[in-house]
Structure formats: structure tokens, C-alpha cells
């Protein structure tokens, strides 16, 4: 039996009103994730939540408090799979706001043994100094991961694929992933972002398999400016990807992060459907 667990990412709820719809409602997301059959949840620590969006601190709000967060998790029998720390990370050094967010995230995660410190690059544009900024991302991510590792945490970097993302293409991956320090930084492949960036999923997983310590699942339609599909209805072969994980004795989380258009209007319903789809299609593979 493999040691693979399934969790849910809060971005599915964040899309409604760009954070406004479910601001300070992490307890609700935890409840729905548990009802959907997921055993974990991955909230965000979004540095710009207050300054740019007018939402609660880090899009955690009251759940910045470890006691409040633990109580909500325990009530619904859901684990904290990790926190996704979202910052630009592209400066010559960490900004004061990034430093504050890093320290907060590490201190919170220390209260939840086994939860992953995920780092995510906030898309910041590709027009100026692309190579320097990509290398800055790798250096800053390694610095954050070293601090996390020194605090007893496991750490993993998650690239994404919006047009303004610094790490979205094969060339970007070759620069940044090859510059990660594997002693402290793993890689979270997001299979939807990989295909949107023009890459094939399995060859990309093969190339960087030594770094994989966390993974995100989202489906891809290829249509429109936000080319996502509800899980199981798009172009990705999640059976094959899950078999790839099992064959390599992967231990950790599969985090479902549905960004399909229908999820904007009904994140609860989509999360429940994702949970059912995983139970019917993927749980037998990892059993």
C-alpha cells in the first residue's frame, strides 16, 4: 500500500471575487474538503492579500492564529497538508514584506509537524531582466527553504503558468529547477501548469523526478485565456500520472486544485465532485 494522501487547495475558493467571496472562511473550506473525502487541505499565505486585494491578512485572516486553525482542522478531521507561501521572490534579495511572510509561515508550520512549506512565485511579468530575475527566484527560494529546513520543515517550490509567470516554459524550468538546492528545496509539479507551459507531463516529471516531494493536480482544456477543465474532463491522464507516482514509491500529498470556470461559481460543489472522482478513479491506484 502506498503512502499517498489526497488533499484540496484553497485557490478553488479564492477565485470567487479574487479572494473576496471566501475571505476569512478557511473553516468553511476545511469543512467542505473533509466532506468531499479529502484528508488534507493546503491554504495559501498570500503576501499581497491585504495590500493589493483588501482581504484579510495573508488570506488566512483569523486563521493566522495556530489555535484557531488547529481547532477547525480537528473539528472536521482534516490535516494541514502544507501552506503555499505566495510572493514574487524575484528581487535581488527578499523584500521586507517577503521576510515577514516567510517568518510567519515558518513559525505557523512549526505548530503542525509534517506539513509542507510550499513556495509559489506570484506572476510578476517577463519583460525586464528575465534571466536575472529567474536566478533571483531560485536563490530566494533556496534561502527560504534553508530557513524552513533549519526549522525542521520539508520545503517544495511550485511554479505556475500565467503569461506573466517567470517560471512557465521548458527554458524557465531548465534555469530555475536546475538551480534549486536539492538538499533543502524539492519541487511541486503542477501538472496543469506543466501542460499549459507547452511541456509534456511525464517527460517533465522524469527529468526532475529527484526533486518531486509534493504534487498538484488540475485538469486542462486548452481553451480560452484560463484553459482549465474540471478534474477528469480535460486532456490530462491522471491515472497515468498517479501510476508514475506509485511506481516511484512517492510518499506524500496529491493536492487537487480545480481552476475550471465552474469552480468560480460553485467551489463547494466542484470540490465535492473532485473528491468523488478521486475516490472512484485514483484511490484504487494508490491502495
PLM regions: where:
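Glycine-rich, proline-tolerant flexible connector loops at the mouths of alpha/beta enzymes
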Residues: 42-70, 124-125
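Conserved residues at the C-terminal ends of beta-strands
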Residues: 44, 86, 120, 218, ...
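Residue-level marker of alpha-helix boundaries and capping positions
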Residues: 19-20, 59-60, 96, 134-135, ...
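Short, conserved active-site loops that position catalytic residues or coordinate cofactors/metal ions
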Residues: 36, 41-50, 82-85
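Conserved radical SAM core fold
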Residues: 13, 47-50, 89-90, 122-127, ...
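Active-site acidic/histidine proton-transfer and metal-coordination neighborhood
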Residues: 31-34, 66-68, 72-82, 87-187, ...
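Histidine-acidic metal/acid-base catalytic patches
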Residues: 1-39, 74, 101-103, 113, ...
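The substrate-binding groove and active-site-proximal loops of carbohydrate-active enzymes
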Residues: 56-60, 87-95, 192, 230
